[in-house]
Amino acid sequence: MPPSPPSSAAADQWNIDYVNEDSPLSPRSFSLPPESPQLSTASPIHQRVSRKRQRATSQGLTYNVIRWPLLFFIFFIIYLEFSAYVITRQIVNVFEWLVAWRGYKAKLRKELRKAKTYDEWVNTAKKLDKHLGFDDWKDVEEDSYFDWALVRRVRRTLTRLRAANDTRGLMDALAVCVRANFAGTESVKMYSETFIGTKKAVEAHIKEVAACLDYVRTATDVSLEEKRAFFRAVNKHYGSSALCLSGGASFGYYHFGVIKAFLEADLLPRVITGTSAGGLCAALLCTRTDSELKELLVPELADKITACSDPFTVWFKRFRQTGARFDTIDWARRSMWFTRGSLTFKEAYTKTGRALNISVVPSDRHSPTILLNHLTAPNCLIWSAILASAAVPGILNPVVLMAKDRSGNIKPHNLGGSRFKDGSLREDIPLGSLHTQFNCNFSIVSQTNPHIHLFFFAPRGSVGRPVAHRKGKGWRGGFILSALESYIKLDLSKHFKVIRDLDLMPQILQSDWSGVFLQRFSGDLTLTPRSTIGDWFHILSDPDRPQMKRMLRVGERVAWPALGMVRNRMTVERAILRGRSEVRTALSHDRTSNDPATSLPETNPELTGALDHVPIESDVDAGFVSRSRRARNKTGSKGGDTPEEQLNLAGVFQLDESSKGVRRRKQKKSGMPLVAEPLGELPEVSPTHSPIATESPQRNYTSNFGDSFRHVRAPSLPALSSPFRSIRSNTSSSSNNVQSPSSSQRFRSQLSITRWFGGVSESSSDEEDEDLGGLQSGEATASSGEEGIPTFQLDSAVESHSDRSEDEMLHSGANVKEEYQSEESEGKIPIPGGERVTQEKIDASMASGERLRPAGGSKGSAKTPPVQDGA
């Protein structure tokens, strides 16, 4: 059946080249004329650059004498071990062909490799599982690769709570079990025992978790604030998924097949990263919607890949003149079709909702790798990042990153005009940066680097590719061959580490190549498309339509076995995203959806598959939000999670800027005097007792989340200081009436230390201690007093007065009165507590069974100035 003709929209995608030489955004406009001999910031990607050779630092006579013989000796050992490794791998292949894959299972395996559609592949994989007895392994719940007892207990608990309509109980249970690789359910080993699927107990657990998340999303007995805090917490714990596309020159075009397989299964993650050739594929993915990608991922895509079309005579002459095989300006113009012209990272994220990440390395040897995305470089042009990521020494010269300013003009991304080159030299897969910026806890790596592809060997099987013999429990080629393969590979890594640590490798083309083999090239799930020997002869050539068709098919087939694992992961991840998206929308419109099957809202109906732009959870986003909240608090605007709003004390305390250089808090009301109360009337403090009353019952989840850690207190701290009281009483008798010059500073220090360990609020920060208006620290319970002012009952066993020395407590009344008058003259509002409290009075109060507490509005209480922190 002939393919249907492309639509008009699809035809426009093929015909538009997004290049306008007269436009100020054109790469040609940034280059100097050919006769110009030098580089400037106005022409940052021009290639005619003459560099001065840097003088090498002398390492000593011994280093210079031994360096080269040692380097040649290590490379000779590497050559011998590499030859042994290749021979070992070939012996394993012959063993599997002669012993493991024989008879009917060999026939099924051949059908599996020739499958043209995913449905055909699934049917063949099910036949293989049934023939090899892997279905029995799926039915058995017990297994040593995951905590099956915990998974069964959690699943039963979730089912019972959901049937009982206990929403808050579900939220507490989900907060524990919604974690990345909970109880080993996401382990690669759980998906390496069969050709398709995993244990039925694991799949039932994942379905129950997703159903419970949808139940919490549509529940009506829980406030929106509780839902928002819950989904934010579980999203932080579970994390997000990322698709990482490696480099590999023309081998990187296998990524298009991997992308097509995930696209047709609707399992594309929102975070995409690419390096070198993978950056070109990632740019095409993140600048098109799903419907547009389905029209482009066809063999005709090879017509748009023309970067290596120059004949030998042209590029050889260019290499002698510039030191690079390809022209930067020409590559920039050809790559603009993949990036939709001069799109920036922020514009691409706004259009498709996918976070594009491209890894580049500064030309400086000691500068760290940089991950460019809509957070770190929002205005950077994607085509300049692709050129920098593909700038392999000898292939393409280092490039200056370009960016758009506020007026839409193009300028260098950094003021210094630093140049960047291929990120594969140091960090081909930037997993650390992805976890830090996007909270990515699950990585899907498509690895096509030709120098690394050979070393990927799974001795116990990989996802969707179990070991054929011993019902999946054996070793590939037997234990001896698998052990020999691992030993040789680890020994090769050891030799490369010696070369790197001893700095034996010289710089080739002004680049350090010592760490090329020492990076991490794998992820939680690693896909390695099967290349051919012919690919090595076309490593720097453009593919034609037949080659692109084969690459698309090979990339799809290598991704099909992993779709089951990715689908289970995305089931929970998207259930969390649905909850965050709908709660965010409901907070804006004060409504929620009652349909559990409600799909994610889309900002543009034409963006099929594009998610609502709920911010991807990241520490960078949190930093921006925290900074903006602090700015709003300084300007006095409302909003934000300030300590006053969290404790419902925003109307009680306000900033006092009267003190010089110190931010203080003061009360708006006249305050609460100290009165005595028998100890027997105080409520008993239990380990689960919340020290601060929340605003409403709806905020119980946000306030009590993590009670086991917030209510840890040290009620016996003052008792530890009792041995020192006698010493202080003996030594202070001669200085009872003498005021030390630094007594106020000592009192401030001692009071701060005491309040740090026995703080009133949930946090131990100094800012929240100041929020309590100078009240002495200790275990406190909040209750509503007169005019909405909360009163605090203090535990006398932790009162900070007991930590003060007697020479600071036994001041004369005249000195105290003068101090309070000076405080009033500075404009501070006095609060109760001015009566002088000595150590003898505290001991007498404790002996009589009474304690001191502040009580707002008590009759007959003297309203005297307070003992303020630092007074």
Swiss-Prot record:
The organism's place on the tree of life at top rank: Eukaryota
Membrane topology recorded in Swiss-Prot or TrEMBL: Single-pass membrane protein
Role summary: Probable lipid hydrolase.
Motif, GXSXG: chain positions: 274-278
Family stated for the protein in its record: Belongs to the PLPL family.
Protein name per Swiss-Prot or TrEMBL: Patatin-like phospholipase domain-containing protein CNBE2340
Compositionally biased spans, kind Polar residues: 594-606, 687-706
GO cellular component terms, semicolon-separated: membrane
One Gene Ontology MF term: triacylglycerol lipase activity
Region (Disordered): 20-53, 586-707, 720-748, 760-871
InterPro entries (alphabetical): Acyl_Trfase/lysoPLipase, NTE, PNPLA_dom, Triacylglycerol_lipase_N
Biased composition (Basic and acidic residues): 798-820
Domain PNPLA: 243-435
Segments passing through the bilayer: 68-88
GO terms, biological process: lipid catabolic process; triglyceride metabolic process
Organism: Cryptococcus neoformans var. neoformans serotype D (strain B-3501A)
EC number: 3.1.1.-
PROSITE patterns according to UniProt: PNPLA (PS51635)
Lineage, uppermost ranks: Eukaryota, Fungi, Dikarya, Basidiomycota, Agaricomycotina
